[in-house]
Amino acid sequence: MDSKHYQVVPFTGAQLPEAFRQVIIEGNQAFHWNEAQSRDDFQLDQAEYYLLLDHDQVLGYVGLHHVLDEATLNLVYIQADLRGQGLGRQLLDFVLNQLTHRGIRHVFLEVRQANAAALGLYQQAGFETLIVRPRYYQHPVDDAVIMQKMLSLSEKEGEPS
């Protein structure tokens, strides 16, 4: 696929077209979310989704919740056959830039300790570990790593730092 056709489109959960909802519901199964949990999330006022699209095909997405100046990244997903190509980093950078310009100052996330690829992605993006919750996840048992990134605009040109 030609990267010049990729675009990131933001949606609130309620705005998501049903076809995109179905893709997200399927992707969320990788995070052990069932269909009811995904559909409930679509209805939350604070739920937002950033979809990475190639024309009308969803390549990946970020799902988050925001309250005041904080956001929690709940879902960062790239299709399995497209991983390792830098799309996750590009999508994450785009989302963080958007959040910064909207006045979000604290971004949190939680990731399985065993998910080395995701941990590396988040560390490269400037997230730092706050705490590790031992044996937090089940099936399989794994520790949860809670991470945070502080967002701020630099004085130069309003760029995120």
Where on the chain are the PLM-derived regions?
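Acetyl-CoA-dependent GNAT
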Residues: 3-6, 10-81, 92-94, 98, ...
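Acidic, amphipathic alpha-helical patches
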Residues: 38, 118, 133
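Short, flexible active-site-adjacent loop segments at beta-strand->alpha-helix junctions, enriched
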Residues: 68, 113-115, 133, 151
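Conserved glycine-rich acetyl-CoA-binding loop
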Residues: 79-93, 102, 106, 112-120, ...
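Acyl-donor (CoA/ACP) binding surface of acyl/acetyltransferases
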Residues: 82-85, 89, 134-136, 143-145, ...
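Conserved catalytic-core motifs of GNAT/GCN5-like acyltransferases
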Residues: 110, 123, 128-145
